[in-house]
Amino acid sequence: MPQVTMRQMLEAGVHFGHQTRYWNPKLAPYIFGARGKIHIINLEKTVPLFNDAMNFLSSIAQKRGTVLFLGTKRSARESIKEEAERCNMPFMTQRWLGGTLTNFRTVKQSVARLKELEAAETDGTFEKLVKHEVLGLRREREKLDASLGGIKEMNRLPDAIFVIDIGHEDIAIKEAKKLGIPVIAVVDTNYDPALVDYAIPGNDDAIRAVQLYARAAADAVLEGKAAAPNSASVREEEFSAEAGDEGKGRRAPAKKATEKKADAPAAAPEAPAAE
């Protein structure tokens, strides 16, 4: 798991919240205090929640799942795109199109159109058309690429969504919640952490803070991918095990124990999600 220290968070300005008059009382447990009418986030509580979120992202990637990186606000676009591309995950950095998740079949049709236009531009089809037709098709391609280019290789719904600003991406979060897709998100002092599955209390505006979140998320995904079992080696092990069983022949069934085993102690309950 990527290690992000409290000092790194301080240097990136993760602890700076919004003005006190805009606060959401449900984030009160994660607020240290106020300075100059600005809420200060308690990083001692942010760090463990941040680590939990990164562990979850890593586990998704380890199972060969897909994480959609989402950041359409100006301060997040560059970092989200760069880090999503680094870990080879889909992303959206322009305006969220309503129904991207809940009407995914229609979105896939638009993506297919984008791929068709890209192929036509490279295979010489455009050269056979008149100039004004080519200009119209290129404008269509550019428009589709701006809105859907980051998800054109996403062939199914994502297994999780990583979000920078839950207020800015409220429509996407509602769609994910409706479909049961887990949401990992940075939550500033003016929002309710209960709206997402894995809340990271922190500054969602500062560019350096956004870079820190996106970089850590990409690192978590890459670590998860590296830890994923090799499908070829797994099949080879299964084949070897089956061959070994055939060579040994059937074993006699084990005799039942005369004494009952003591019940195993119940597993400790997981800590409840932060609200």
UniProtKB/Swiss-Prot annotation:
Spans annotated as Disordered: 226-275
Q: Name the InterPro entries for this protein.
A: Ribosomal_uS2, Ribosomal_uS2_bac/mit/plastid, Ribosomal_uS2_CS, Ribosomal_uS2_flav_dom_sf
Show the ranges annotated as biased composition (Low complexity). 264-275
User: What Gene Ontology molecular-function terms does this entry list?
Assistant: structural constituent of ribosome
**Keywords of this entry:** Ribonucleoprotein, Ribosomal protein
Biological process terms from the Gene Ontology for this record are: translation
Q: Which GO terms describe its cellular component?
A: cytosolic small ribosomal subunit
UniProt xrefs under PANTHER family: 30S RIBOSOMAL PROTEIN S2 PROKARYOTIC AND ORGANELLAR, SMALL RIBOSOMAL SUBUNIT PROTEIN US2M
Family classification:
Belongs to the universal ribosomal protein uS2 family.
What protein name does the entry list?
Small ribosomal subunit protein uS2
Taxonomic lineage per UniProt? Bacteria, Pseudomonadati, Pseudomonadota, Gammaproteobacteria, Lysobacterales
